[in-house]
Amino acid sequence: TISADKAAARAAHLLLSGPAGGLIGANQCFPHSNLMTFDMGGTSTDVALIEGSITPATSAELDGLPLAMPALDLTTIGAGGGSIAWINEGGLLSLGPASAGASPGPACYQQGGSKPTVTDAHAVLGHFEGAETLSDDIQLSSEAAARAIQPLAEALGMPLSDTASGIIDLANEKMAQALRVISIQRGFDPADFALTCFGGAGGLHLCSLAQSLGMRRAV
């Protein structure tokens, strides 16, 4: 943690601190372990590889600008629970990089959002059954999620549930590819690592990602 006064004086030190905090937490929970981590939030997902210990980045940048400060070796992709699904010019289902964000959020939040998101796809498929109440202000609605995804289903000529599954598959493939980049393309076998998730949407995708990468352990 950092005090408000220190944060004001050294604001640059807060850059990418959220993803770094999750990575440090995973390493402390499972010290000296081989881990692949993914932090899936509303707009993006951060992935990293820990081979016994956390690796500092040799260089880092934010929005194309170099950061002249210490950073961890993280890779970020534009896929999160709020990523918006759409039909591209070729008539195919696509996902992101646009996001519904925290406000108005996914359609299923019933806070004014109307665009179909990854979270809405989970709601349509019943993945939140028994856990629909997020707070006093947010009650998840599978009906609202279905209304948002239905136009995509009609455009694709597919059942609603298949369209929802397709949205989730797209999100999974984006994250799986990012995990392959930090492992296979660097000479590591994912099967030698445990997949560890955090972030609001991480648990919804953990097992599917582990299976697609041939990983035997998921936390």
PLM regions: where:
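N-terminally biased helix-coil "hinge/interface" segments that flank
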Residues: 1-219
